[in-house]
Each structure stands twice: as structure tokens, then as C-alpha cells.
A protein has these predicted regions:
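Amphipathic alpha-helical binding modules
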Residues: 3-6, 83-122
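Generic alpha-helix signal with a bias toward terminal, lower-confidence helices
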Residues: 16, 28, 56-57, 77, ...
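Arginine residue identity/basic-tract feature
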Residues: 13-15, 22, 66, 78, ...
Length: 122
């Protein structure tokens, strides 16, 4: 399991967004996804962070956290598949895993394992 820094989630989210937009501009029509797909990715992430109560002090049960992770990963799988697998590349995968796993730990998940691997197709 890679060690992720405890930098603010907003910074990691912004790097993810910037990387997707930068590649889209560089590759043009050949990138495989559109601004709407990037917006949908951010919506999935924001919904996930909200479901975990990001920024709140209360902790969730481990089953609730795992269910939120599973939903976000499956939603991202579907979106990436819709984009022909081009939306989530290596850099994006690392940022997404960091966002998902750090938020899960902050919400109360005890494991240091990468629980996204059970469902992740990217």
C-alpha cells in the first residue's frame, strides 16, 4: 500500500482535475473524454467525500465506509469504461486512490490496505 501524504483533499482533487484538463487540451479530440466526463468524475468524488462526512468530526462504521468506497469505485469504473478507459490513467489512478483511501481513513476505516482493489478496474 503506497503511503499518501496527509495534504488537504482539496489540493489532491485539484491536481486530479488539472491533470485531466491538461491532457484533454494536449490530446485534443483524441483524448477519449470530454469536459462533461471530467465534471462527472469530480461529482463522483465530491459525492463520496460528502457521504463520508469529509471535514466533520464524527466517525462512520467500517461497513458504511466500505460501502461508500465500493459505490465510488464502481461509479468511476463505469465512467472510465464509457470513456474507453482513457479518463483514468496512472497519474489519475494515484490521485483517485489517495482521495478515496485518505478520506476513508479519516472517516474511521482502520485498515491500511488498498480496499479499492476489490472493485477497481482502472
Amino acid at each position: 500500500m503506497p503511503k499518501f501524504s496527509e495534504q488537504p483533499q482539496s489540493e489532491v482533487r485539484q491536481r486530479l482535475l488539472d491533470g485531466m484538463i491538461r491532457y484533454m487540451k494536449l490530446a485534443g479530440n483524441d483524448c477519449g473524454y470530454k469536459k462533461a466526463d471530467v465534471a462527472q468524475c469530480m461529482k463522483i468524488i465530491d459525492g463520496y467525500l460528502a457521504a463520508l462526512g469529509e471535514g466533520k468530526s464524527s466517525k462512520l462504521s467500517e461497513p458504511k465506509i466500505r460501502e461508500a468506497v465500493k459505490k465510488a469505485v464502481l461509479d468511476l469504473n463505469r465512467l472510465n469504461e464509457k470513456c474507453g478507459g482513457s479518463l483514468i490513467e496512472t497519474d489519475q489512478r494515484e490521485y483517485l486512490c489517495q482521495l478515496l483511501l485518505v478520506a476513508a481513513r479519516r472517516a474511521g476505516l482502520k485498515t491500511r490496505d488498498d480496499i479499492t482493489e476489490a472493485w477497481r478496474e482502472w
